[in-house]
């Protein structure tokens, strides 16, 4: 009986050590030239009595080049569907509809969105997911912020991570500074799941906010293939809440 107990304890220790070894992974982008992906972003925002917005956007991304130090991608928005209510007015837009199917407000929104859908977004990233350069052709002011968020990019740490590991990144764009913390909550079946939390601060004390959620990373490719983030923002006497879901699938 004692011998059997010792054997069971030994097996338990070996199994535990084996699992621990498997749970230490190095997160890196692992693209191949010619890879193509479909990025789907679904977001909704509520401003209480002020209104709100629901939007679904799809974007195609192609890996144009894979070099020793960086990766170059080319992306283009393929569809936008939006419903917005503001000041008692409802506005709808669907890029899949013809001009005849759009109402007057929809046609006005098309004049704003159509140039975005024609633009090509050129991104250069390093293997840790840091954005080195972003260019748009033709250039459209403000579009970089939309596309960078939609790509669901995460800056990976230099060292390997295991369950409980955490790291932070900072980003500033158009007067908004965002600090995001990532914590590894599980590693299983070739996936790393991260708990996401963070704070937002707008310049000039215009507002503050928080974010929280989860994202899942495919270890083999380094792609954040599924993400769901909740946010709250307090600005100019308004409380804004919203959620953003992003899925990335290989085509």
Tell where the protein language model's regions lie, with residue ranges.
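Acidic/polar residues at beta-strand termini and the immediately following turn/coil
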Residues: 92-96, 126, 218
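Solvent-exposed helix/loop surface patches that form functional interfaces
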Residues: 111-191
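Short secondary-structure boundary micro-motifs
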Residues: 12, 46-48, 105-108, 137-138, ...
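Bacterial Sec-dependent N-terminal signal peptides
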Residues: 1-27
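Acidic, serine/threonine-rich low-complexity disordered tracts
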Residues: 22-91, 163-251
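Mixed-charge, low-complexity intrinsically disordered segments
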Residues: 76, 81-117
């Amino acid at each position: 009986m004692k011998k059997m107990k010792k054997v069971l304890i030994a097996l338990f220790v070996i199994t535990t050590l084996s699992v621990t070894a498997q749970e230490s992974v190095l997160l890196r982008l692992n693209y191949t030239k010619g890879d193509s992906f479909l990025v789907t972003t679904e977001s909704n925002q509520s401003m209480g009595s002020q209104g709100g917005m629901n939007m679904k956007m799809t974007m195609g991304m192609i890996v144009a080049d894979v070099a020793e130090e960086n990766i170059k991608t080319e992306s283009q928005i393929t569809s936008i569907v939006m419903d917005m209510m503001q000041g008692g007015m409802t506005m709808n837009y669907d890029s899949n509809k013809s001009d005849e199917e759009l109402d007057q407000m929809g046609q006005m929104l098309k004049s704003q969105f159509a140039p975005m859908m024609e633009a090509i977004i050129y991104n250069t990233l390093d293997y840790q997911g840091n954005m080195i350069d972003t260019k748009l052709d033709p250039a459209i002011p403000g579009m970089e912020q939309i596309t960078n968020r939609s790509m669901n990019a995460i800056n990976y740490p230099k060292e390997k991570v295991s369950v409980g590991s955490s790291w932070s990144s900072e980003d500033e764009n158009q007067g908004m500074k965002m600090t995001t913390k990532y914590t590894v909550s599980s590693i299983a079946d070739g996936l790393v799941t991260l708990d996401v939390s963070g704070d937002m601060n707008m310049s000039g004390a215009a507002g503050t906010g928080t974010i929280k959620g989860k994202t899942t990373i495919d270890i083999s490719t380094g792609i954040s293939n599924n993400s769901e983030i909740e946010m709250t923002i307090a600005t100019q006497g308004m409380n804004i809440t919203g959620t953003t879901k992003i899925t990335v699938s290989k085509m």
